[in-house]
From Swiss-Prot:
Transmembrane segments: none
Disulphides: none
Role according to the record: Function in general translation initiation by promoting the binding of the formylmethionine-tRNA to ribosomes. Seems to function along with eIF-2.
GO cellular component labels: cytoplasm
Example of a GO MF term: GTPase activity
Annotated protein name in UniProt: Probable translation initiation factor IF-2
Region (G2): 37-41
Gene symbol of the encoding locus: infB
Domain tr-type G stretches: 3-225
Keywords, ordered alphabetically: GTP-binding, Initiation factor, Nucleotide-binding, Protein biosynthesis
Source organism (scientific name): Methanococcus vannielii (strain ATCC 35089 / DSM 1224 / JCM 13029 / OCM 148 / SB)
UniProt-annotated stretches for the region G5: 200-202
Chain positions covered by the region annotation G1: 12-19
Binding site for GTP: 12-19, 76-80, 130-133
């Protein structure tokens, strides 16, 4: 059975050494002149199995590595944004991943986010515990870690420090996330235990161990997945859309199965539909020593087979976006390929809600990833699209917010905001959150949501009528009626202009027309403990339906009482709560229902 190269992606937290490790892996070769060294593909680097065997020759016997895969195809773009963008039907394009963790710093937010994405995509991974050379006293040199890991080479204190950092900063965190993990040389059951491979991207220590472990695991557990359809047509994913001088718009793609030929037809799935076009050229990069003219960087290939990175030149690629699924087929298979692509796009369709926010992303895979994370944060999503933030998006978000201010949000992942959209944004209350890190955008969403909920809660609370109890002061009746004017003391709560007043037998007496302070200045409200003159317009006649020392109540509707009691009770001051409870007790007695207000 013919096997293709496993596709390998590198993930990890910022500054933990993803790019440096990739550079070190790409530069792996026994000598500069070695035949079959690293082959640079479009968007990926192929490390042939012979190169892996040569740099790892001291390890082959230790791990009983009988490797028959042709090599490893390592995606050039590190990070989980690239990982999520590169999708195929059924999950991630990458067959296996390297999770880079700084052995000295341990897990960070992006490390955990990367693990969550790997779990979600069911992608097996190996941990590269990087920056081994920074452990105090560690003697790091290019070559296998396993040969350098002994007390003949290392000081005992350095060995002890290594063990502490390996456990405290890497293995313990993996255990907390539900994974068994251990140093790769101690792993007995690779189906249950994550391999942790210590490396230094600076010295190259551990890179041979990492390559042999990745290759061995891929062959052992992914053989069926790596079976190559040597007769079938090419299946792949768009990595990037680029303008190239002399070629126009081209696409860089990873082909993960089958064979593509010049003159075949490319079928690409887009959010807006399917694009078909005739392949003008399949291009591979020239070797470095052939790149004398920067305008002539590529050489045409009549035929390419998986797994590989390739640049494709074809007309009518304007609407293609990164992360789109593709097929390259003979003309007679176009309809079949279109059906496959349609089914694949349906897998990417994100379920939307009747109400919610808008999310935009640069690729379908990224859109799916951020939608999944926002769902975990309990976000409702009204619209999810690939592409830049447009004026139309702002207008739509503004209309969504008219029914609920919590819908007036656009989350933009790794996309631009068009100039007319920026102008429209200034005219509205729509909030735009932009970023290139998924976990940070989700955090920003959580912070915005909390702030908005508090603001809305405060606004609604301020609009509600709050209970208050007042007492008519003796010797302070200034006018009997039309309006009645008297001095009152606020016993509980806050008395406001416009509040409707009732007696303790439920009679409506009128509304508060005016409140004055001791300087005879009009004020809008009087709080607990204050003694103030008030005028009450309506049915109140002092000396008849209201007398000195009477306790009066601010009238509150039952729906408002329910909201105050069930939603906002914790937001009320102690005296306001007391006013609410006493008012409810009075109304339950008057209405002869213990459920009033409940």
């Amino acid at each position: 059975m013919a096997l293709r190269c496993p596709i390998v992606s590198v993930l990890g937290h910022v500054d933990h050494g993803k790019t440096s490790l990739l550079d070190k892996i790409r530069s792996t070769r026994v000598t500069q002149r070695e035949a079959g060294g690293i082959t640079q593909h479009i968007g990926a680097s192929e490390i042939p199995i012979n190169t892996i065997k040569k740099v790892s020759k001291d390890l082959l016997g230790l791990f009983n590595a009988n490797l028959s895969i042709p090599g490893l195809l390592v995606i050039d773009t590190p990070g989980h944004e690239a990982f999520t963008s590169l999708r195929k039907r059924g999950g991630a394009l990458a067959d296996i991943a390297i999770l880079v963790v700084d052995i000295n710093e341990g897990f960070k937010p992006q490390t955990i986010e990367a693990i969550n994405i790997l779990k979600q995509c069911k992608t097996p991974f190996v941990v590269a515990a990087n920056k081994l050379d920074r452990i105090p006293g560690w003697s790091s040199s290019n070559g296998p870690f396993i040969l350098n890991f002994n007390e003949k080479v290392q000081h005992p204190n350095a060995m002890t420090e290594f063990e502490i950092r390996l456990y405290e900063n890497v293995i313990k965190h993996l255990n907390e996330l539900g994974f068994d993990a251990d140093l790769f040389s101690r792993v007995k059951d690779t189906t249950r235990t994550i391999n942790v491979v210590p490396v230094s991207a600076i010295t190259g220590e551990g890179v041979p161990d990492l390559l042999i472990i990745i290759a061995g695991l891929a062959q052992k557990f992914l053989e069926q997945k790596l079976a190559l359809n040597v007769e079938g047509y090419a299946k792949g994913t768009v990595l990037e859309v680029k303008e190239e001088k002399g070629l126009g718009r081209t696409i860089d793609a990873i082909i993960y199965d089958g064979i593509a030929r010049t003159g075949d037809y490319i079928v690409i799935g887009n959010p807006d539909g399917i694009v078909t076009s005739k392949v003008k050229a399949l291009l591979k990069p020239k070797e470095l020593d052939e790149m004398r003219d920067p305008k002539d960087k590529f050489k045409p290939s009549r035929e390419i087979s998986a797994a590989t990175g390739v640049k494709i030149s074809a007309p009518e690629l304007e609407m293609v976006v990164s992360g789109s699924p593709l097929r390259i087929v003979p003309k007679e298979h176009i309809n079949k390929a279109m059906d496959e692509i349609t089914e694949e796009i349906e897998e990417f369709t994100i379920k939307t809600d009747e109400e919610g926010i808008i999310i935009k992303a640069d690729t379908m895979g990224s859109l799916e990833a951020i939608a999944n994370e926002l769902r975990k944060a309990k976000a409702n999503i009204k619209k999810a699209e690939v592409g830049d933030v447009s004026k139309k998006d702002i207008i739509e978000a503004s209309s969504y917010s008219s029914s609920d201010p919590l819908n007036g949000l656009i989350i933009s992942f790794n996309t631009k905001t068009l100039p007319d959209a920026k102008l429209e944004l200034e005219k509205t209350d729509v909030k735009l959150l932009e970023g290139k890190i998924i976990y940070k955008l989700v955090e920003d969403y959580g912070a915005w949501l909390k702030e908005m909920e508090e603001l809305l809660k405060s606004d609604e609370l301020n609009k509600l009528t709050k209970p208050a109890m007042i007492k008519i002061l003796p010797n302070c009746i200034f006018r009997q009626k039309g309006p009645a004017v008297c001095g009152v003391e606020i016993l509980y709560g806050t008395l406001k202009i416009g509040s409707h007043i009732m007696s303790d037998d439920g009679k409506k007496l009128g509304y508060v027309k005016e409140i004055r302070n001791n300087q005879q200045e009009n004020i809008k409200e009087a709080k607990v403990g204050m003694q103030v003159p008030v005028s009450i317009d309506g049915n109140m006649i002092l000396g008849r339906n209201a007398k000195e020392n009477d306790i009066l109540y601010v009238e509150v509707s039952e729906p408002e009482v329910r909201k105050l009691y069930h939603i906002y009770k914790d937001e009320l001051r102690g005296d306001e709560k007391e006013a609410l409870l006493r008012y409810m007790e009075l109304k339950q007695k008057l209405e002869k229902s213990i459920f009033w207000g409940m």
